[in-house]
Curated annotation (Swiss-Prot):
Keyword Metal-binding: yes
Protein's name according to its UniProt entry: Neurotrophin receptor-interacting factor homolog
Main localization of the protein described in the UniProt heading: cytoplasm
Localization of this protein: Cytoplasm; Nucleus, Nucleolus
Residue spans, zinc finger C2H2-type: 478-500, 506-528, 534-556, 562-584, 590-612
Segments for region (Disordered): 324-370, 382-458
Record organism: Bos taurus (Bovine)
Taxonomy of the source species: Eukaryota, Metazoa, Chordata, Craniata, Vertebrata
Complex and partners: Interacts with SETDB1 and TRIM28/KAP1. Interacts with ATRX. Forms a complex with ATRX, SETDB1 and TRIM28.
Amino acid sequence: MASGLPTDWFREPVTFEDVALGFTPDEWGKLDLEQKSLYREVMLENYRNLVSVEHQLSKPDVVSQLEEEEELWSVERGIPQDTFSECPEAQLEPQLDPFPAGNPLMNIEVVEVLTLNQEVAVPRNAQIRALYAEDEGLSPEVLREPPQHLDKPTADPEMARQRFRGFHFEEVAGPREALAQLRELCCQWLRPEAHSKDQMLELLVLEQFLGALPEKLRLWVESQHPVDCRQAVALVEDVTWISEEETLPTQGAPGTLPPAAQQDTATWPVKALPEDPVTFLDVAVDFSTEEWGLLDPTQRTEYHDVMLETFGHLVSVGWETTLDSKQLTPQPGPPEEGPACPLKEEEGSSADDARPSTSGEALEAGAPGVWDTALKPVTLASENTLPPQPPGDSPQPQASTGPDRGRVSLQKAVPRKRLRKRDPWLKRGTRGACVKLPPKRGGAGKAVESGGDGGRRPCARNAPQITFTRIHKGSQVCRCSECGKTFRNPRYFSVHKKIHTGEKPYVCRDCGKAFVQSSSLRQHQRVHTGERPFVCHECGRTFNDRSAISQHLRTHTGAKPYPCPDCGKAFRQSSHLIRHQRTHTGERPYSCSKCGKAFTQSSHLIGHQKTHSRVKCKKK
């Protein structure tokens, strides 16, 4: 075979450096996204080809970075070790190129990019040459021109940030000037010569956090000039509640309030805990008679749930009510004036069911009169007496006479848009005491309904304690007999059982592939429809899977949540960590069925199996 190449070239084994292509930092920074993607594919293919022909070599760092989809600015080949020592840290940061894809930025000699598979190499190298030959006016000397600095450098980082965010392409003559000015503004804002990478990342996260806050709250927090995310979070947590009529201060020195706000200091954060014990009225929400009349049944139901949840929180932290056994007994008498809060008839509540014989039975049945009486000490004060209701309506909550007259009882209610005080001494995330309890289990394992309200009961004095006990101690746990895994949600358990049985009830109509879950089928159908609903706002790439865009976003944020416990090296994906750990354990799970050779990665096995198919073709 006459190839025209000297035979001396093939005496020494080929190395990865022989088929790699190097870039200087300036050259790499001027490549657009399409060129960088093409470079990544070529380099990874060269490495796989070397592995497929049984070329034993340790994986270069550049290949690991390319597999992680990291931004590279150089390859070790042809670049001295001291090339980057003179470059400041800011220049090493990867920059997104604003030039449109397909516009060549460099004339690069691509003859050094060699592949061992000529069927792939010939058309690909021709594609690269055609891409870079479109614009003959560009030269390496022109592209290596230093960026132009701004005529008037901005000393204030905040001003530089505003100019950076509000930059328009029409302000400059061309794309090169736009990129240079954006880079200069970003350096003046983030100050890489004085800040580390973590500090610059903190500034970016702080800006995004402030932008996500409501406008009034954001203006007040910005007026306090927080220097990091921790201070910003502390300021937001201090503002426990702000009514819609109130306005936050936007001017003034940090830590000072305008005169109008200083007159009403009760609405602003007070870090010291109150000396007196908290009561239910301290965390309750009041309604006037007119406001109560404007609430629809859904809002009143929500109000009922929220107030009982707050009551449960107080009981869970040791707050004691003044209820006794007499107050838990329903008191006969005519109904008092109060807001109309009828119970739903379809839930099974009736006038006959509302009068059990004993207090215990009354609490279990959830009679409205009993619960209203039991909740007298923890009701909301109303300024005016409540309007009377016409006779013949559904059972209504009773309001007490005497000192408690004019109070709104805690029967179903509340606006969708509510403002609640958050007490810092209450544990966050605690579920409310008034929840939909699971049905009781009879002797034969059948569900027993407790009352006609579908299992949802209001909470009296002892109800929060009982409910919390059931949540933490009486929750039913489903255990898999095959693998021993436990589940608290029966739906998750039923999905898990299909893994062992092999059941796949959800079938794709286009290709016939079956899935265990309907969500997996919907995700698969996007392959046929071409739908890619998840868009990266940083680079514009689209994805058809939420997990795929989550992994991609880590390339922008630099997050690596999967560290190796042996050497400490971190990875963006769990699969990369599992693959890396095989270098420590020596595990080679992928074996060749022809020769028995084992590999650590499936891609290496696939490349190796091609060598057997090529040998068969040559024998034929």
